Amino acid sequence: MNTDTFMCSSDEKQTRSPLSLYSEYQRMEIEFRAPHIMPTSHWHGQVEVNVPFDGDVEYLINNEKVSINQGHITLFWACTPHQLTDTGTCQSMAIFNLPMHLFLSWPLDKDLINHVTHGMVIKSLATQQLSPFEVRRWQQELNSPNEQIRQ
């Protein structure tokens, strides 16, 4: 059973809408770790960005296999049921969870926003646009006691 109040899992007995998980007080979260296979699908109200740095991984997103190639950035609205099904040889992956209100506040292309909010999985064409060094630095900044650095 999932204990994260902002996430739903397919093994829960009580169903909840991912839209009910929204909170304007949520902040962006960044994980930098080895990916792990998920026993069930889950969903949450944030936009999820994944970057595997040293190997390809495979997700099941809305019952469709989605491969994320090493070094590529993949973005999707995580209210769509998703499950990491194959970690391959990947040992280092960045996972960004962006609250929807934050994502929508950025000056992004309207087509991109439309694609994401309609369940499309967006993949970068180019590789290596983000480094592990940058991910670690952003993690440190988000966890800084200095509010000006966190912003």
Residue ranges and their predicted role:
Residues 1-67, 112:
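Generic protein-terminus/edge-of-domain signal
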Residues 2-28, 81-144:
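A hydrophobic/aromatic-rich effector-binding and dimerization subdomain
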Residues 52-54, 77, 87:
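A short, compositionally biased micro-patch
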Residues 63-78:
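Short acidic-glycine-tyrosine-enriched beta hairpin
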Residues 46, 70, 90-92:
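A structure-centric signal for secondary-structure junctions around beta-strands
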Residues 143-151:
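All-alpha amphipathic helical-bundle segments outside canonical DNA-binding/catalytic cores
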Residues 50, 74, 96:
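Conserved GNAT-family N-acetyltransferase fold
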